[in-house]
Amino acid sequence: ALGQYMTPAPIAAFMASLFPKNFGAFHLLDAGAGEGSLTCSFLKALRHTDRSFPHGEASLFEYDVDMARKLEKNIIQAVEGLPVKPHIYHTDFIEYASTLVLHKQRLFTHAILNPPYKKISGHSAHRALLRDAGIETVNLYTAFVALSLALLRPGGTLVAIIPRSFCNGAYYRPFRQYILRHSAIRRLHL
């Protein structure tokens, strides 16, 4: 009912490989983290490179209580031996992020996500929060991507799984305009 789709390990590893290879300290955002497969893949990629980084942080959001228990276990194992501090939030990402966007907080250098896919009611609290944050959208996936973009620091990188439906049609025109105003698309993988 939450619109969640889990990311298989090979896809998570591919997504993690898409980040630039040269960066120092980082703060990763994983919105709708599920069991943590995307963040775990990101951290695994860090372990298997020559690059060094002084420290990192990972902020993971998971609303589902059962999923959050698995997430905590997986992330504790994934950060072992790495100078990475995890922050796991059991809260509504849209509520949390829209407040940060309103206060112009740009906290993250990296974002990796497989957002939930579900329509947003035109009269819902989520829709009102998003409008207040300057985001007009009809689906959770576009809301999560737009909020994540808004929370990236200048020069930050977002890697996300999103359906190609955003590419056409009137419903997603505001989302397309938002992407083009606030980011540069460097790579599409179909």
PLM feature segments, named:
Residues E57, K85-H87, A184-R187:
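Conserved beta-strand segments of alpha/beta enzyme cores
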Residues H55-G56, G156:
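A short helix->loop->beta-strand "cap" motif at the edges of active sites that frequently abuts
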Residues N22-F23, L102-R106:
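Glycine-rich phosphate-binding loop signature in dinucleotide/nucleotide-binding domains
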Residues H126-G134:
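Short alpha-helical oligomerization interface
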Residues A1-R51, S59-A78, A97, P115, ...:
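Class I S-adenosyl-L-methionine
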Residues S37, Y63, M67-K70, T137-L190:
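Conserved Class I SAM-dependent methyltransferase catalytic core
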Residues L82-F93:
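Conserved SAM-binding strand-loop segment of SAM-dependent methyltransferases
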